């Protein structure tokens, strides 16, 4: 839909092309849904994964986070950094207890086909974000399965890093404004999903703006 009269089709097209490139790069990696193809002018379809998000009880079975760690290792080995591992809702627990990682909109992939120094900059960014992926993985493990933690994982889960702390401080005003805007829109009934009847309405990540305005 247009925003302030400006067409935004190019944003949808960019997001679709970006995720397609990432999914194709990760084809065959265990725990990554399969790319199925484009749908319509801007849409696309991926493999349906039957499972529940990590932020839904009960806790995952023993060994879940070790398997998840191997998935992230495989993703990183393909030159892709996930970039959204802080959201538990992006990590699914399949009926057999195995992990799946979904939603690659924020993923960054290495671009060896780009000229230097662009490929060097992107490569450094991929390396940094991959490190943040491991930080969030270990943080989730510490909070959900602390008895399975190793000493190294414990250290990683506590190491936010200077850039991470700076990012949190700089974006705090934006997050507050965004949360207030979403809360107001939700109260006015403007954030109703077209697939609401098909959704699991236990969605903890949305509770910060689903609360009623004081």
Summary of predicted features, one role per range:
Residues 19-32, 52-105, 134, 140:
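Conserved kinase catalytic-core helix
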Residues 2-7, 52-54, 115-123:
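Short glycine/proline- and charge-enriched loop/turn segments
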Residues 94-210:
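C-lobe/activation-segment region of protein kinase-like
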Residues 1-24:
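ATP-binding glycine-rich loop module of kinase domains
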Residues 41-53:
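Conserved short submotifs of the Hanks-type protein kinase catalytic core
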